[in-house]
Amino acid sequence: MHELWLCKRIVEIIKQQATGNKCRMVKKIVLEIGQLVAVDKHALNFSFKVITQGTIAQNAELSIVEIPGEAICNSCQQIVPMKQYYDECLVCGNHSLTLTKGEELKVKSMVVE
């Protein structure tokens, strides 16, 4: 269950940013997570609630923005959606794609007090 580890890292980032900006409380965290990262959102939300207990982010709302997968076909040079690794180009059927979006995992923003 890598969601628990991810939440630990997220809380570390939150603490660093909040301390550096002299914040008292974190109200909301916005995460960007690529569709191809394979994160279970329910497990992530559960882990976040557990990990943030007793921290500056204890009652923070967790908002997850999913970034769809996208790739450039190495054959026809078209930009195509990618729902999973090893998808084929929807234009020419080639399997040689270069991923351009979908593996993101970052804290996009925080609302603090």
Swiss-Prot record:
Ni(2+) binds at H2. Belongs to the HypA/HybF family. It comes from the Bacteria. Keywords: Metal-binding, Nickel, Zinc. Transmembrane segments: none annotated. This is Hydrogenase maturation factor HypA. One of its GO terms (molecular function) is zinc ion binding. Zn(2+) binds at C73, C76, C89, C92. PROSITE patterns: HYPA. The gene is hypA. InterPro entries: Hydgase_Ni_incorp_HypA/HybF_CS, HypA/HybF. GO terms for biological process: protein maturation; protein modification process. Involved in the maturation of [NiFe] hydrogenases. Required for nickel insertion into the metal center of the hydrogenase.
